[in-house]
Amino acid sequence: MKNDINNQQGSQQQVPPIDNPFLTMLGVQFLENGDGQAHIALDLTEQHMNSWQITHGGVLMTLLDVVMAVAGRSLHPDQKGVVTVEMKTSFLQPGGVPGGRLDAYGKAFFQSSTMCFCEAEIRHGERLIAKAMGTFKYLKQLRAGERMRKICGSD
């Protein structure tokens, strides 16, 4: 999967990075996307660690989820976005320590007009850390947050 992205650089149509305060707080870097593929990275700090001082599994799952969403979204840049319907994650090795860097690679392998099916992996250098598969639904309109504010009476 890693090499697929590098081999496609010339033909990619970039999708704007996701405007997400959580991802900004984590420090996620959006490096490449287009043609159903994506690459993001995270420079690890103490805040990304669990009690054993290795990368927290929730951080790894977030990277996998986001890189698959960006890959799927790159096939339909005219859509508002995608939401995760289902995700399966396999943790293969501990995910890195402060000062390290994780690279996540995503690929959309099948799509319909409303759904996209993706796979992703995270690497720490050459070490394969985790893999995932996910199903995503394309959205055209209202953001879930906007809808929830209306339901909860915040607007």
Please identify what each model-predicted range represents.
Residues 1-155:
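Terminal targeting signals and extreme-terminal segments of soluble enzymes
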